[in-house]
């Protein structure tokens, strides 16, 4: 007994594990698989963990998840789904400026609060005009004013119930013959708050609620569908107008200024300067240009992997930094160009520097599972950008196909020859637009179907919350505070430890995550 008994009770606890500073000052470049976080003390449930985190200096998300601006990951469908679940999507720019701006517009109009620029028709318009508007915009609850414009007198409204059973030969009828007349409408006065208007709409059991001024002129409208979205998606990321947040990628060339203008006109909330190596005079000049022309527009710079790179972009005025070079599953930059940095080291080093200036960091690349997300956030990142993890979800662009009985979607790096051949923007990202010989920095592949974002992202959220619970932190802010104070401890993993930490010693198994 004397061999292992020590007097004095349990007041003595030996120092265990490494601080983040000790872990990353060893001189080795570390990936997310090279270390683990040591557990802490639990006195709360996982669903109490607050995942609120900063995307930029002025934009805060309730979920620290961001979809990558890749043409096989984020267009309007993905951006809408990400915003509804508390994150944000960045529309790719491997397309025409007009297409990209229209995708942003779709996101901004998906949920609107007070709609101040609705589709409006006049009594002399015809039924076929309603069907055309429905085909173009996806709805047919349209207010009718005497001139067919906003700001003129409200005379009625057309809903699906008014036109559902009309025969084709009736499509030339005037709307004044079939619309619901003004005297039968429920309206709200101008100056009403959104909360009051929603309550009126709820009581009325109508699909739309027109807002009129003292002269009975239409000034806005709200939709019942938005009430349902508010109920179903309480974490949704919204701007001051109650529209969904949406980001977009642009390049750093002169013609990207035209793209920027269209995006700003469409209502984009934040732009990311999409470059494989962000520490360039081209990006610095573009940051300054955007800040001068659109001072309220948030700008994310990158990509960077060192404090020296980050310094130049912070000095130029960025509102956040995107960190990662060559760590993505489809990226071969490190292999081909011998430049880059292991992602865990890059995230820690840049985050530790950028926090001194209040600049949030987005960890971009190398995310293979929810554990990697938790590790990136514990190393100082405020949000995590995902490509392959979200590819092949229902909301990702592209069609499913089958190979050996497995349902797949195409996924490619923006530095792949495939993407470069599609549009010049991909070449600009890798400074290759003038090269006669293209050097691919990415590959094309396929990813297995993951189902809908509306099921997959809640799984990721729950995983992050459980990770924070095991750490003993009730919020991501507390996780980062524990890391910087040295309270949060880490441990390096040998290759054998990594094998031990995975599934092993089984003849066969099925791995279902959610």
Curated annotation (Swiss-Prot):
Positions of the catalytic residues: 331 (thioimidate intermediate), 429 (proton acceptor)
Phosphotyrosine: residues carrying this PTM: 400
Oligomeric and partner information: Homotetramer. Interacts with CLOCK; in a circadian manner. Interacts with ANKRD9; leading to its ubiquitination and degradation by the proteasome.
The species this protein was found in: Mus musculus (Mouse)
The encoding gene: Impdh2
Function of the molecule: Catalyzes the conversion of inosine 5'-phosphate (IMP) to xanthosine 5'-phosphate (XMP), the first committed and rate-limiting step in the de novo synthesis of guanine nucleotides, and therefore plays an important role in the regulation of cell growth. Could also have a single-stranded nucleic acid-binding activity and could play a role in RNA and/or DNA metabolism. It may also have a role in the development of malignancy and the growth progression of some tumors.
Residues the record lists as Phosphoserine modifications: 122, 160, 416
Positions carrying N6-acetyllysine: 511
Cystines in this chain: none
GO cellular component, one term: cytoplasm
Broad enzyme group: oxidoreductase
Pathway(s) the chain acts in: Purine metabolism; XMP biosynthesis via de novo pathway; XMP from IMP: step 1/1
Activity control summary: Mycophenolic acid (MPA) is a non-competitive inhibitor that prevents formation of the closed enzyme conformation by binding to the same site as the amobile flap. In contrast, mizoribine monophosphate (MZP) is a competitive inhibitor that induces the closed conformation. MPA is a potent inhibitor of mammalian IMPDHs but a poor inhibitor of the bacterial enzymes. MZP is a more potent inhibitor of bacterial IMPDH.
Principal localisation: cytoplasm
Lineage: Eukaryota, Metazoa, Chordata, Craniata, Vertebrata
CDD domains xrefs: CBS_pair_IMPDH, IMPDH
Binding site for IMP: 329, 364-366, 387-388, 411-415, 441
Subcellular location: Cytoplasm; Nucleus; Cytoplasm, Cytosol
Cross-link Glycyl lysine isopeptide (Lys-Gly) (interchain with G-Cter in SUMO2) per UniProt, renumbered positions: 195, 208, 438
Record PTM text: Acetylated by CLOCK in a circadian manner.
Cofactor: K(+)
The name this protein goes by in its record: Inosine-5'-monophosphate dehydrogenase 2
The keyword tRNA processing is annotated on this UniProt entry: no
Enzyme Commission number(s) from the entry: 1.1.1.205
Keywords: Acetylation, CBS domain, Cytoplasm, DNA-binding, GMP biosynthesis, Isopeptide bond, Metal-binding, NAD, Nucleus, Oxidoreductase, Phosphoprotein, Potassium, Purine biosynthesis, Repeat, RNA-binding, Ubl conjugation
GO molecular function, one term: RNA binding
């Amino acid at each position: 007994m004397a061999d292992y008994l020590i007097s004095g009770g349990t007041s003595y606890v030996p120092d265990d594990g490494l601080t983040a500073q000790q872990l990353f000052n060893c001189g080795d470049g570390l990936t997310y698989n090279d270390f683990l976080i040591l557990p802490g003390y639990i006195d709360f449930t996982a669903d109490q963990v607050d995942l609120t985190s900063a995307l930029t200096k002025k934009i805060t998300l309730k979920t620290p998840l961001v979809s990558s601006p890749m043409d096989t990951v984020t267009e309007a469908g993905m951006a809408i789904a990400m915003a509804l679940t508390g994150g944000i999507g960045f529309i790719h720019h491997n397309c025409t400026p007009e297409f990209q701006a229209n995708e942003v517009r779709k996101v901004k109009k998906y949920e609107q609060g007070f709609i101040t620029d609705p589709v409006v028709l006049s009594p002399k318009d015809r039924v076929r005009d309603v069907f055309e508007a429905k085909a173009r915009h996806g709805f047919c609850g349209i207010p009718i004013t005497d001139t067919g414009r906003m700001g003129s007198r409200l005379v009625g409204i057309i809903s699906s119930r008014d036109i559902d059973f009309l025969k084709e030969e009736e499509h030339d009828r005037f709307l004044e013959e079939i619309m619901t007349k003004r005297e039968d409408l429920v309206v709200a006065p101008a100056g009403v708050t959104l909360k009051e208007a929603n309550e009126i709409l709820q009581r009325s059991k109508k699909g739309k609620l027109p807002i009129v001024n003292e002269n009975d002129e239409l000034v806005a409208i709200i939709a019942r569908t938005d009430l349902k979205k508010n109920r179903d998606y309480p974490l949704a990321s919204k701007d001051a107008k109650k529209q969904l947040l949406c980001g977009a990628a642009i390049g750093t060339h002169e013609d990207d200024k035209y793209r920027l203008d269209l995006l700003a006109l469409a209502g984009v909330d934040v732009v990311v300067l999409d470059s494989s190596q962000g520490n360039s005079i081209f990006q610095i000049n573009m940051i300054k240009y955007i800040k001068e022309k659109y001072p309220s527009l948030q700008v994310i710079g990158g990509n960077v992997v060192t404090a020296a790179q980050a310094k130049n972009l912070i000095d130029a005025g960025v509102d956040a930094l995107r960190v990662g070079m060559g760590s993505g599953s489809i990226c071969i930059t490190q292999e081909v160009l011998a430049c880059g940095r292991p992602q865990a080291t890059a995230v820690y080093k840049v985050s530790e520097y950028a926090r001194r200036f209040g600049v949030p960091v987005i960890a971009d690349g190398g995310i293979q599972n929810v554990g990697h997300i938790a590790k990136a956030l514990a190393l100082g990142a405020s949000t995590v950008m995902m490509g392959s993890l979200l590819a092949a979800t229902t909301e990702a662009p592209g069609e499913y196909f089958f190979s050996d009985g497995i349902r797949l979607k195409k996924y490619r790096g923006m530095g792949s020859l495939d993407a470069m051949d599609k549009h010049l923007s991909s070449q600009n990202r890798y400074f290759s637009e003038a090269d006669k010989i293209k050097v691919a920095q990415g590959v094309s592949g396929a990813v297995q179907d993951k189902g809908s974002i509306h099921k997959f992202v809640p799984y990721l959220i729950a995983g992050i919350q459980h990770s924070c619970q095991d750490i003993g932190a009730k919020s991501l802010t507390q996780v980062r505070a524990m890391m910087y104070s040295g309270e949060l401890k880490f441990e390096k993993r040998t290759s054998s430890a990594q094998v031990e930490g995975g599934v092993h010693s089984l003849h066969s198994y099925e791995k279902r995550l959610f």
